[in-house]
Amino acid sequence: PIGKHFYNYYTNIVQTIDTPDLIRSGFLVTYKAYQMADDFSNLKKGANGDYSEKSQYEHFNKEKLYDGVIEEWKKRANDKKTIIFNCNIKHSDETAQAFMDAGIKSYSVTSKTSPADRERYMDEFENGDCMVINNTSILTAGYDFPPIECVILNRATDSLALYLQMIGRGSRIFPGKNNFICLDFGGNHNRHGLWSQPRQWELSAPKKKKKGEAVVKDCPKCEAMLYASAKVCEYCGYEFPIVIKSLKDGVMKEYYEKDMP
């Protein structure tokens, strides 16, 4: 939604160009997303309506999660300029240090970073051998560095606007860049769907999806995130079985798209 109470003042909203249109027109590049399965029921909302920094830090500040981020990055984005969004300053600093400990040059840019250090860190990221830049929100909106080819969501958010802004940092066109990768460790694709999907903007709050209703799913072969309704993986060609249940005898049988009449 555009605003909680805008429907009190306006009756219509002008639908303009959407992300899929910009991708088709060549103004943005598409992406491939991977999401880590995890339980986020322990996260609590703060006064701003989003998940609190405290509950997020308690969830994400685990050695296995730091190791998991580095492992997935090495597996899928080892040679790509990467921006990471973390839940708070301490988390950003510690994630950067975890990469450094693994032999990967990485910096953390936050509100506590001195102007001189910030300038040096950003220069080394954009023009030098630093592959990974960490932040909390400083680089969320307005930061434009087209060579970025990997965005890591090392946090959770219930804000669709923030979700779109963070992932959008990787969508800028650049010579030789056909797409970018998003590694989602915060379950955000389950909340908001694919960054590249069409959206119908409304003045009032959208209807909440039913509990257990899937927004996206992962391909069991290549692990990429897809629309929940996808029948074939657009990346590796895997065909999802169509399961049909016989009401008479309760026997389940798998059918593939090519087998359907």
Predicted feature descriptions by range:
Residues 20-29, 174-228:
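A conserved SF2-helicase RecA2
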Residues 93-94, 104-140:
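Conserved helicase ATPase core of P-loop NTP-dependent helicases/translocases
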Residues 74, 81, 199-261:
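Long, largely alpha-helical accessory region at the distal end of helicase-like NTP-driven motors
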